[in-house]
Amino acid sequence: MQLPHYSQLKQQQCRRDRRSLALLLAFLVLTLVVSLCAGERWIWPTAWLDDAQQLFVWQLRLPRTLAVMLVGASLAMSGTVMQAVFDNPLAEPGLLGVANGAGVALVLTVLLGQGLLPVWVLSLSAIAGALLITFLLLHFARRHISNTRLLLIGIALGIICSAVMTWAVYFSTSLDLRQLMYWMMGGFSGIDWRHGWLMLTLLPLLLWLSRQGTVLNGLTLGEIQARQLGIPVYRWRTVLVLVMGVQVGLSVALAGIIAFIGLIIPHMLRLCGLTDQRYLLTGCALAGGGVLLLADTVARVALNSAELPIGVVTATQGSPWFIWLLLRNRL
């Protein structure tokens, strides 16, 4: 009698998860529409095809909106993967220094290249920096140190990278590098269709990662249980770290360092009952894109004469969550 009962519970959970994904999809569509409407001038959807509004909507706002959505999805999914791979509920690209590693590589490349290098070289340097920090963290994680120490190591690496970026900007006379430092606070100003190749590179990685829920379910059980299930743990960790590093590097190349999205989104969804990684990954992509679209809209319209760095908005949103998670996990 227990098997039918278990089967019914599993079916009910699947239906709840699908309903949650449907609600998250509706939330993403709503925030996408608001993002396209909002700006110095509010443009209703009925006016999007007007000749006078096409430049604002299709050439300026649409590429930015797509970039925000993809970066939000990338950071939220990367946070979910990091929490599973490192077995640390507080792991996320910004907090563990991965995004800062991408940023310092980008700044040093601009400094050494004197602002003359093409965008694809800067993107590759950001990816390399993110991968370097991620593999360092993976090395420490394999030494079975505590979650607290791994968290502190990640924070220390992030502080070191931030210090290097600050020194580079302080001693630089290049206006490009000073503007880049402002951009490293997080922002999507200047995004247009010329950055479309970065978005197209990010999209297949997101789609592939969203299909790896079964593997992540095994990894969350622990290394021994995962091996008993036939999962090649070392190989999957390496592959997931590579994909995650590339995603974070591309995200930093597009928008700079944006913290806390990878931390708060997975925990919010888990608190809402979305615990199966097969649904959680997709949910993180939808929720991450929607939340970052909201933050970007706030950053654009909060001030009349300027634009807030989106990293400031997400840090304001995420800092209370981080404190709460620290207290909840008694670290």
From Swiss-Prot:
Q: Name one GO molecular function term.
A: vitamin transmembrane transporter activity
Question: Mainly localized where?
Answer: membrane
| Membrane topology summary | Multi-pass membrane protein
Transmembrane as UniProt keyword: yes
Segments spanning the bilayer are: 21-43, 63-85, 90-112, 116-138, 151-173, 193-210, 239-261
Where in the cell does this protein reside? Answer: Cell inner membrane
On whether Zinc is a keyword of this UniProt record, the answer is: no
Domain of life from the UniProt record = Bacteria
Which GO cellular component term is one of those annotated?
Answer: plasma membrane
GO BP terms: namely: cobalamin transport
InterPro entries per the record?
A: ABC_BtuC-like, ABC_transptr_BtuC, ABC_transptr_permease_BtuC
Q: Which Pfam families match?
A: FecCD
Entry similarity comment: Belongs to the binding-protein-dependent transport system permease family. FecCD subfamily.
Q: Which NCBIfam families match?
A: PRK03784.1
Quote the function comment for this protein.
Part of the ABC transporter complex BtuCDF involved in vitamin B12 import. Involved in the translocation of the substrate across the membrane.
Q: How does it assemble?
A: The complex is composed of two ATP-binding proteins (BtuD), two transmembrane proteins (BtuC) and a solute-binding protein (BtuF).
Name under which the protein is recorded: Vitamin B12 import system permease protein BtuC
**Which organism encodes this protein?**
Pectobacterium atrosepticum (strain SCRI 1043 / ATCC BAA-672)
